[in-house]
Swiss-Prot record:
Lineage: Bacteria, Bacillati, Bacillota, Clostridia, Eubacteriales
Role noted for this protein: One of the primary rRNA binding proteins, this protein initially binds near the 5'-end of the 23S rRNA. It is important during the early stages of 50S assembly. It makes multiple contacts with different domains of the 23S rRNA in the assembled 50S subunit and ribosome. Forms part of the polypeptide exit tunnel.
Family membership noted in the UniProt record: Belongs to the universal ribosomal protein uL4 family.
Spans annotated as Disordered: 44-76
Oligomeric and partner information: Part of the 50S ribosomal subunit.
Keyword RNA-binding recorded: yes
Gene3D superfamilies referenced in this protein's UniProt entry, alphabetically: 3.40.1370.10
Gene Ontology molecular-function annotations: rRNA binding; structural constituent of ribosome
Annotated protein name in UniProt: Large ribosomal subunit protein uL4
One biological process term in Gene Ontology: translation
InterPro entries, sorted: Ribosomal_uL4, Ribosomal_uL4-like, Ribosomal_uL4_dom_sf
Top-level taxon of origin: Bacteria
Compositional bias annotation for Basic residues: 60-76
Record keywords: Ribonucleoprotein, Ribosomal protein, RNA-binding, rRNA-binding
């Protein structure tokens, strides 16, 4: 059972917490992580790319010259794909790139991502995180105290907290998530994984 230190907002160790083996201590499955990240990025694609075919390009309705007798190659339209300003053959059209992956695979990938953060000592547990007012400087000081102010980090909260969310919004390299919006791509993409103690309890409740 992985055991990690619990920090306060001043960066001091105030205790320890035991994390569940079946969530934070599994063997990392890199293939599952890769599959889920590819799926996430594919689902984010707009799919609005488009090209015009020969029939959609303006002009080219008349045969440029007669079929025989000119000595030149035969052509039926100046908008064929081989012509300058011609249509595109087999070009991209608007489409959806979305596809689904099995729920078990998503869960395995998420647990693998969390376990990798524990293995690499990149997971930090905060005792609590609450601000009386919206203040970016307060959040910046917390990151500085935790020694993660010069790297990228994802912050996971148990529930919505407006003051914390807005205080973190303008800090470069910091992304705020909640237990229900936690995802493999953001966990892997950021160097550090910061999570509050009550969020750990919620993660273990949801993914046990």
């Amino acid at each position: 059972m992985p055991k990690v230190d619990v920090y306060d907002i001043n960066g001091k160790v105030v205790g320890e917490i035991n994390l569940r083996d079946d969530i934070f201590g599994i063997e990392v499955n890199k293939h599952a992580i890769h599959q889920v990240i590819v799926n996430q990025l594919a689902n984010r694609r707009q799919g609005t790319q488009s090209t015009k075919t020969k029939s959609e390009v303006r002009g080219g309705g008349r045969k440029p010259w007669r079929q025989k007798g000119t000595g030149r190659a035969r052509h039926g339209s100046i908008r064929s794909a081989q012509w300058v300003k011609g249509g595109i053959a087999l070009g991209p059209k608007p489409r959806s790139y979305k596809y689904a992956v099995p729920k078990k695979l998503r869960r395995l990938a998420l647990k693998s991502a969390l376990s990798s953060k524990v293995n690499e000592n990149e997971l930090l547990v905060l005792d609590s995180l609450n601000f009386d007012e919206i203040k970016t400087k307060q959040m910046a000081n917390v990151l500085k105290n935790l020694k993660v102010n010069d790297t990228t980090a994802v912050l996971v909260l148990a529930d919505k907290n407006r003051n914390v969310e807005l205080s973190a919004r303008n800090i470069p390299g910091l992304k705020t998530l909640f237990v229900n919006t936690m995802n493999v791509y953001d966990i892997i993409r950021h160097d550090k994984f910061i999570i509050t103690k009550d969020a750990v309890a919620k993660v273990e409740e949801v993914y046990a």
